[in-house]
């Protein structure tokens, strides 16, 4: 690295800033002829930077001058005199600037790296460029698993409305159950059609027409109302199951009207109570409630079977209540129910009414005989009958 500059060139450092080329030439001219005096100055201020280069014509003169003048005082300052070296000089001259230039890049890097590093790390923390958006979406998926959870629930929710469209696969199940529920709803209406039409109270019809006609998707929103509605038009099983299982809400809804009027219902309650599968009544009832209650996602697969069983209890409940528990199991067997459910899914409009007409005329008879539905028919059942007409529009 340390290469001597051309022979006879001396480096003079530590100069007084006031010392100029003339003073240097006068001082060093004693040792020989000087070819060049180069005082390094600041470009901007044009002031001396404190060092200079003096080139002697004879290298021997340069050596003598360096030997004598090194460490001597010039203009009040001790000066350093040495053989100029290219790298030493240029590194000393440019070297400090290059360090500075390097320092500046480092500084800039520091700003870029420091500032940019923080920026990057925040960006990593935040959008993370792509990772951050991925992170962002990961967060959203974590939220969005709420969205995505929400997302999947919408398919189940859609599973509610798809009953109209005979939704595919899993939804189709709940759609089967849902169509069944709808068919039962209509069937229940037709089954009670005789009594209900006598006293259809518009207030009931209007509120229920809203949720019902808005679609089974309203099943999501109207879970509580739909929950009651099955009680309304199929109160027999629901009231029964609720009586058996102590759901006071239904007892409050229909006890005096439905059971108070009929001692026979008490007997039939005992009849059903004796039935060994009381728990199964409750389970299908609950699963059916889930299906209708807007948790199709939860209850879809069970709700199909549950719905079927519940429908059996429900659609045939009049027979069962009339004492035809066996006839309920035989004539309204699950296979019959399921085939009806399929018909309903295939033919949501006609299938409902036809299967109702075919499947549950006994309901109408038994209910007209028992009469316990008449008061409720005047209430919710009437509204549902009217809605039955409205639903067939779908």
Curated annotation (Swiss-Prot):
Disulfide bonds: none annotated. Residues 150-165 have a biased composition (Pro residues). GO terms for cellular component: nucleus; ribonucleoprotein complex. The gene is RBMXL2. The keyword Nucleotide-binding does not apply. It comes from the Eukaryota. Residues 8-86 form the RRM domain. Coiled coil: none annotated. Residues 67-78, 196-231, 239-285, 334-350, 383-394 have a biased composition (Basic and acidic residues). The keyword Ribonucleoprotein applies. Keywords: Nucleus, Ribonucleoprotein, RNA-binding. Residues 321-333 have a biased composition (Low complexity). It comes from Macaca fascicularis (Crab-eating macaque). Residues 67-394 are annotated as: Disordered. This is RNA-binding motif protein, X-linked-like-2. GO terms for molecular function: RNA binding. Its main location: nucleus. It is found in: Nucleus.
